[in-house]
Amino acid sequence: MKPFRLYWSNLERYEECPQKFLWYRGWGLLDLGGGQGRRKPLDTSSRRSEHHALMGILIAEAVENIYNKEWWRQPKDLLARLNDFLDKEFSYRLQKTYIKWEESPSKSELLATCKSSTLGYLKIMKHNRLLGDLYSRSEVTLKVELDGVRMGGRPDIVINRSDTGLLIIDGKNSLSPGKYTNKDQLRWYALLYYIAHKKMSSLAFAYFRYPPENPPKSHLNKKKPSEWTGLIPVSVSEKDLLALLDRAKQAYTKILAEDFEATPSSSSCRFCDYQRDCSAFRDLQIEKADLSQSGKGFIDLSFS
């Protein structure tokens, strides 16, 4: 087994429920039904449609080409080049992606969203001058080690400008800005960058579907809406980074000790693919039902 490295997705999942982390990832010599070290197998009925993941991967690859292959240097042909790339890559990846079409938009709608969201990022990029004279890269690999804790991450976009400094961006294709996002994801990248380079970062989420000329309703409904740029800044301080590092150390130590006890809750179980296999989840349901029947609480099965 390769030495374990803690990524944000690992930390978030472990803090939600250690058993959830284990079943999604696998560990060491443990056999969860799919072989030693492999994740717990899922039957088709429990498996979630991957159409959202498909769009996210394609948009991320398009943005990666803009920066890492420097397609931005040929602006006249850029959009046509991106659309051609998305046409080909969509056909290729679609064959390898599990999609429940009764839950997903059509193929043409999925591809159209990939193209419009990529165009949305181009507009956000232009409006916010997201090219750095010092550094502009996408899908940047960060690997660090501190006090015996191995950590890693891959920020979507890293921009370093001599006038505005370092900016780390996480791209989102969400219909609802701010929903199902965790600001600590960006702070995690800031922590890694600080450990590696001793430099603080500015942080922001970029919402591909909402370029500057198309602000979301949630922004327009504010009492005094500011200018919409397509970016939502995330605050970060050295105190935030120290707190996150402490969480990482605690989780890392427990994972290496193979502490994988289930900690079910409405929030951690809501989007878990393993509800049917989890006795802790069933016990939680029974407990809620008992509370409801006794008049001491209420049952909320909206996540089941």
Predicted regions located by residue number:
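Non-catalytic protein-protein interaction segments used by genome-maintenance enzymes to assemble
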Residues: 136-191, 196, 250
